[in-house]
Amino acid sequence: MGYEVRIWQKDETPAFDAFDEFEPDIFMGQSYHLDEALFKCIQHRPHMKVVLRGSDWGDIQKDIDLDKYPILVASKEEKKLLERLKEETGKPDFVHNHYHENWIKHTHNKWEDIGIKPFSLIHGADVFEFGLRPPVDVLKCDIGFVGGYWPYKAKCLDKYLIKLCHPVGDYNIKIFGNRNWPVVQYMGSIASENVGSLFASATVSPNISEPHSQDFGYDIIERPFKVLMSGGFCISDYVESMANDVFINNEIVFAKTPEEFKKLIDFYIKNPDERIKHMKAGYESVVENHTYFDRVASILTELNLPEEAAKCINVKMSLFGAEE
């Protein structure tokens, strides 16, 4: 597409050096990384468009126990510095987060109080890393899962996935990840280029969210997009926004309880052809609406760069056999 992109390793290169060396037209960062040095770099470049991933700051936080649910929320210092940045520079152009637009008005509405628009930018799929592929014999299994295991996430993993690991042998389960899982089905790490092959080879690729996603319903993780883009079949725990806002056409089968999750696993292992309609709907949905080409196009549209946004979509369409 003709863009030059530089990833700034902020802990290795000072802000002034990074910006002087590259002189970006668009800067994308995080609201919680704003400091005085970055402030000045933005201030000295009035032509530069600025997009920041914004921490949660909205009415919904008053109902959430942040000791129980470690959600990233905006700090007092972060709010003050962003308010000053907006007053003095008019930046950022907007903040975004990966919640659907039906929810971001509740999770991020306080940003509007300081003149900053919150923008929905849900996760998607990388079409170069994930895509249709044949099953791989050594990765074939009843249940295939890639992810980490730590105490907070274990609150859900234990009920949905770990429970199925016992007795050993009831299911052919392959678990990969960068942390040690407390089960013999854990097979260590997996190369990133093989993750999509696991999703394509497993009978079921489950999606299991963290406690706040299940309990509050708005945080949709990236895994289901990867599974569907790879042509895999996904059974997911129930996350309200994922079921009602994003995957609303039978792309994913949802289970509201661990018991229902197990029943669905058993049904689709015994009846694998019943997966096909969901796999087809899932792949088509992601290709049409949920690739990272679509997400970049959304950013460029919001920045009032419609011609650049159209280029993104045309590149996507050319990859899938058509062009707008």
Predicted regions and their residues:
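Short amphipathic alpha-helix used as the core "switch/output" element in two-component signaling
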Residues: 42-44
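Short, electropositive alpha-helical surface patch
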Residues: 24-25, 257, 291
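C-terminal amphipathic helix plus adjacent low-complexity
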Residues: 262-324
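Short beta-strand/loop segments at the ligand-binding rim of alpha/beta enzyme cores
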Residues: 46-51
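Nucleotide-sugar donor-binding catalytic core of glycosyltransferases
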Residues: 1-22, 30-40, 54-57, 63, ...
